[in-house]
A protein has these predicted regions:
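Sec-dependent signal peptide cleavage junction
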Residues: 3-43, 155
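Amphipathic N-proximal alpha-helical interface segments
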Residues: 12-17, 62, 66-90, 132-154
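Short amphipathic alpha-helical segments, especially helix-boundary/capping motifs
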Residues: 16-22, 39-41, 76-81, 92, ...
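Flexible "stalk/tail and boundary" regions
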Residues: 19-20, 106-119, 123-128, 143-155
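Short, non-transmembrane alpha-helical segments in secretory-pathway proteins
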Residues: 30-51, 95-115
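Aromatic side chains
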Residues: 45, 49, 64, 68, ...
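A cross-family detector of function-defining hotspots
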Residues: 53-70, 114-133
Length: 155
């Protein structure tokens, strides 16, 4: 049976731009594995994602990244040292992509197949990270829930 997706509250302390900046600082730093995050972070995580299992923590630039599973779904999220949730993302099926996002993708790359899809909740935004494949070509797109394409990169 499918497990309901949690819908935790993302902090409103920071603007979307500030959150993006904080996440970028995490990504460019060398993150360290963490056995146990501060209790304020782990207790907030346990409230936000009570069914999480296979939990792995890392830290860099004062940001805690946690990767885990709920049911068969992979998740990743980011907390501040105060336990404020900045972003969470999870893998979704092609059937779960909103029509406007799917249509924007197909319009741009009609011959490509959907490969890996993540739904991202970052600040007040909902985005979709969509990887497409066509023969040997891969493209990764970042699309807002209204269908606006923010970024594309070929691999």
């Amino acid at each position: 049976s499918a497990i309901a997706q949690p819908k935790p509250s993302i902090t409103t302390k920071h603007t979307n731009d500030k959150i993006k900046e904080m996440l970028t600082s995490f990504k460019i730093a060398n993150s360290q594995d963490v056995i146990t995050p501060p209790s304020v972070v782990s207790s907030k995580f346990n409230i936000d994602f009570p069914q999480a299992r296979d939990i792995e923590w890392e830290v860099a630039s004062g940001i805690y990244e946690v990767e885990f599973e709920i049911g068969y779904t992979d998740y990743k999220c980011y907390y501040t040292t105060d336990g404020d949730l900045l972003m969470y993302a999870f893998n979704i099926n092609v059937l779960d992509i909103p029509a406007v996002v799917k249509n924007a993708t197909i319009a741009k790359y009609p011959d490509y197949d959907f490969d890996d899809i993540k739904e991202i909740h970052r600040g007040t935004e909902v985005l979709f990270d969509i990887e497409l494949k066509h023969r040997n070509i891969e493209v990764e797109m970042l699309i807002l829930e209204n269908g606006t394409i923010l970024n594309e990169k070929f691999d």
